[in-house]
Amino acid sequence: LKNTTVNYPSLLTSALYNTVEGFAIKYGVTYTKSFANRRSYAIMPEVRYGFANKTLTANLSGNYFYDPLKRASAGFSVGNGIYDLNNLGTMSQLSTSLNALLFERNFPKFYKRTFITARTNRELATGLQGAASVGYAKSESLNNHTDFSVFDFKDRNFTSNNPFMPGADAPLFPVYKSLNFNASLTYTFGQEYMIRPDGKFYQPSKYPTIKLNYRKGINGVLDSDVDYDFIGLEISKDRINMGLAGYSQVFAGAGKFLNNKAVYFPEFQHFRGNNSLTASPDIRRFLFLDYYLFSTNREYLEAHFEHNFAGLITNKLPLVRKLKLEELVGINYLTQPLKSNYTEYYFGIQRLFLRATYGFAFDKNKQVEHGFRISYGFN
């Protein structure tokens, strides 16, 4: 059909394995329709079935891009699914499957969510984007349903699906209902843009981006069990050019639950931790922080800095120069009531999408962990 595209993954990439669902299939397609006035809409159905827990979930999302000059859209999501307890994500689907099948490790933990959400997004001024959403959901804890692994390691066992009680299948939280409202303002300083017939396109800015976010859990309406107010502020810059010395990137975020009368774990403020040898590169990712144990329903401050020397040192070494390696150093920092002054330092090398780093983690100036980390993908 004219001006229509359908994107669908291969069945191979849709297969997965974890200890909650066992072997499972997660399959979704994206149908996009474009119009002469440069407006478009996209429909995204998805189904998922776990063979061990015998659970079928399905959901449907849609987005309508109705004003390309104002970068405006409206959308919805409805259905249910199996989701990571950490809404920032932990491991990729492939890494989760390989760790469970080959190494008897089930790092990610999951829960079931049934939901309906409406959202909107629009440019309010050049460089200033506003977004809002309202959603109603029912959330349920899940248990493991299989302990199959190709190799059986005598010194380890799979842990439960509760990260705080790894030896017992106790629910992390009761079944609860939530009515949530989210709003955010994102502003990029010195934002330049280009207008074409098919829309308004932002150009990379030399200045940072700030984001103000507010989340509210509305109690009592539609039997909603949650009751909280969260406000957060983030500032980031993905590429700060330093000439021949390379480039840097930085992210800092702070937030506080102004009211936390009823906050269940999926609603906590989460962080991008890492329990594995491998991880996708991300300026917000810690190298050694647990995925779940330090999520908070109080206040926090996190900061991340990384500098890539872009071959400044390795290019001076005749034999190494041909490898086109890039040197990098970085620091990650977190403080919150349960994890005060946690700091990571790391250094490493990178070649295209593959990087190897060695890091040290300190908790209140006491070294608590160190080791190698391998990352793949683009940051």
What are these regions (language model features)?
Residues 1-379:
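Exposed, low-structure sequence patches enriched in small/polar residues
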